[in-house]
Swiss-Prot record:
UniProt keyword ATP-binding, yes or no: no
Biased amino acid composition, Polar residues: 1-10, 371-381
Gene Ontology BP terms: mitotic spindle elongation; vesicle-mediated transport
Region (Disordered): 1-25, 362-408
Record-annotated membrane-spanning stretches: 82-102, 120-140, 158-180, 235-255, 274-294
Protein name (record): Golgi apparatus membrane protein tvp38
Gene Ontology cellular component terms for the protein in this record: Golgi membrane
Membrane topology (Cytoplasmic): 103-119, 181-234, 295-418
Provenance organism: Neosartorya fischeri (strain ATCC 1020 / DSM 3700 / CBS 544.65 / FGSC A1164 / JCM 1740 / NRRL 181 / WB 181) (Aspergillus fischerianus)
Lumenal-side positions: 1-81, 141-157, 256-273
């Protein structure tokens, strides 16, 4: 009994931090459950730790999103909440209707697909459909690509789909940029994340644009969103869209397989049906995996470029402040300079000093008489570093006596880069 009591007391008195290692004598006196717990912690597999870390990240992201949603919901008025609920219900109904329509459209096209395959009018009408769904917030781009493969086959359908996509996305980009020009300017001046993403497209813009186009993002919404970045030019965006057109073979191929299954269902053997169905599933799986992988790589590349841009701006800020002269422009391109200036303000806040010496303030302290004509607060430009010695233009504070009734004290703090 005394031995058990002593070992239990020692175990309870041990510190919670596992940083310090115990001697063999102390380990022998520890109770059995402490050895079991420590062995379980030490034998945890790396895969278990990775799964725990991934699960924690998912939980944290979900928690942040829930908090943000609740915060936004509290700010809404009564009628805004009614409108939000109505919009959500409408979106759900439209999504269900679109899924039902997509499933039925191939049954409707089955009897006329062979006749429309040789019709240039049908080709042109479907081309216009793909072209116009490039404008936000229209949907149906992937469905029209599958229909193109269903009616015209994989290669002819791909040509229709690719040409309409390239021209439609470029025109949508230009129109969206024209309409959203005020929004773009406001975002560039206020949102540091938007400015950082705009600057990342300055380095390998074409490569990053191709990666964005390969991501599984809503097509028309992506056209409008990318148009808000002033560092992206319409021709570059059109070229990036043209370079990823081999991706468009996926929906065209799926459409052609669906037509074969619908027309020759009774004639095909079970093995042929299985091959066609497996090819469709495999193609969809490859598309999903590729999109997910490129999406992760795109985010990683964007973060890398943002960190590089911030490091360059930080070095420029520190060099200018060490030399005591204001910052010049970051780029000859006005759009790039605007984005860099927005990012520079954020970096100045992180470093601890401002670009224009906002702390250089002349403070006037009036006497107790309180003259109405005496100013209370003025600002002056910084004229030079602090110095102890006097010049001919400087007055001796001890020789001036008490001075006038209103005295001016200059408050100036300047943070030097370490």
């Amino acid at each position: 009994m005394p031995a058990d009591y002593t070992s239990t007391a020692r175990a309870l008195s041990l510190p919670m931090s596992p940083a310090e290692s115990l001697s063999p004598a102390e380990e022998d006196t520890q109770p059995l459950w402490s050895h079991l717990a420590s062995s379980r912690r030490n034998t945890a597999s790396p895969s278990a730790r990775e799964s725990t870390g991934l699960r924690d990240q998912v939980v944290n992201q979900a928690t942040k999103m829930l908090r943000r949603t609740k915060k936004t919901w509290r700010r809404l008025t009564f009628w805004q909440r009614i409108g939000a609920i109505g919009a959500a219900l409408l979106a759900i109904l439209l999504g269900l209707a679109f899924m039902i329509f997509t499933g039925q459209v191939f049954f409707w096209l089955g009897p006329v697909a062979e006749k429309w395959e040789q019709s240039w009018l049908a080709f042109f009408v479907l081309w216009l459909c793909v072209f116009f769904v490039s404008f936000p917030p229209l949907v149906g781009w992937s469905t029209f690509g599958t229909i193109a493969g269903f009616i015209f086959g994989i290669w002819k359908g791909w040509i229709l789909y690719a040409t309409a996509t390239v021209l439609g996305s470029t025109c949508s980009f230009i129109v969206s940029r024209t309409i959203l020009s005020k929004f773009v300017n406001r975002m560039m001046e206020r949102d540091k994340r938007f400015a950082a993403l705009a600057l990342t497209l300055k380095y390998d813009g074409l490569k990053l644009l191709c990666m964005i186009r390969l991501c599984p993002l809503p097509y028309s919404v992506c056209n409008g969103a990318v148009s808000t970045f002033p560092t992206v030019h319409p021709l570059m965006y059109g070229l990036a869209t043209a370079l990823i057109t081999p991706k468009l073979l996926v929906p065209a191929f799926i459409g052609s397989r669906i037509r074969i299954l619908s027309e020759k269902n009774e004639e095909m053997s079970a093995g042929s049906k299985a091959v066609n169905i497996c090819s469709i599933i495999l193609t969809i799986g490859i598309g999903i995996f590729t999109g997910w992988y490129i999406y992760r790589r795109t985010l990683a590349r964007a973060k890398e470029l943002e960190a590089k841009e911030r490091a360059d701006i930080r070095r420029s800020l520190q060099a200018d402040h060490a030399a005591h002269h204001p910052h010049g422009s970051f780029s000859e391109d006005p759009d790039v300079n605007t984005a860099a200036t927005t990012l520079a303000r954020d970096e100045e806040e992180r470093i601890g000093f401002n670009d224009f010496d906002d702390d250089n303030v002349d403070l006037v302290i009036d006497d107790e008489s309180g003259s109405e004509n005496s100013p209370n607060l003025t600002k002056k430009q910084f004229q030079g570093p602090y110095r102890d010695e006097f010049t001919d233009n400087d007055s001796d504070v001890f020789g001036d006596g008490d001075g006038p009734d209103s005295q001016m004290f200059r408050l100036h703090t300047h943070v030097r880069s370490g």
